Amino acid sequence: MFQHSATSLQQLPEVARCHMASFPDSFGTKLGLAYSKKSLQWFLAGENRFLFHITDEGRVIGYCGGFQSTGLGDGSTSGMMQYAMNEAAMGMFRKPWLFFHKDVIRFYPLIIKNISRKITGSKNTAVISPGGINLITSIGLVVIGVHPAYRGKGCFELLMHHFEKECKERNATKMTLSVKSSNTRAIVAYKKAGWLNTAETAKAIEMYKTLDV
């Protein structure tokens, strides 16, 4: 029987292993367990973030994490990268060919900026959103994954149900996400769950779903 629970620090290794099994070819997985665990730990380091998982007889089979922005400039991608910078550096030191991985090349500007912040000790200061853009009532779905052995068995729908419930409890009126344009399976699943397209490029699709609170 599937069970839902908020993820604790002690449960991060199992959630990270589920993440790596769900995305075996991703850059984060190639960096190793230490990086995957640390990047997911970012969701436990702030009140405006959350992480939960689904288990089947004690085994983690799916997970989901969200982020509620407090203003412009406090993005989840940069935050996770900076939080797990040491683990990323160690992973790339052991596998230097990852410096030429397509995902690393794409994030070179962001990586350089985060390294600079790490050296200088400066923090990314959020700017309060201008009138007309209410980021605080919007929550982003940042990470979600289902173990390959449990796809098509209702785990994804359960994750989406609890994500939506968590967003409502945080008084959000809108949920957002970004998905790769090539991830057809995920796009179909999101649309089936009521998500709509808001923007589209050759590489990614931005989606949203409004909430009745």
Sequence positions of predicted segments:
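Conserved GNAT acetyl-CoA-binding A-motif
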Residues: 137-142, 167-178
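Acyl-donor (CoA/ACP) binding surface of acyl/acetyltransferases
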Residues: 148-153, 157-159, 168-174, 210-213
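Conserved acyl-donor/pantetheine-binding loop and adjacent beta-alpha core of acyl/acetyltransferases
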Residues: 72-138
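A short helix-loop-beta-strand connector motif used in the catalytic cores of GNAT acetyltransferases and
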Residues: 41-53, 68-76, 114-115, 140
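Conserved beta-strand in the GNAT
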Residues: 53, 59-68, 130, 140-145
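C-terminal "cap" of GNAT-fold acetyltransferases
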Residues: 173-184, 193-194, 200-213
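Short amphipathic alpha-helix that is part of the acyltransferase structural core
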Residues: 1-34, 59-61, 68-95, 99-100
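Conserved acetyl-CoA-binding loop-helix of GNAT-fold acetyltransferases
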Residues: 143-146, 152-165, 188-192
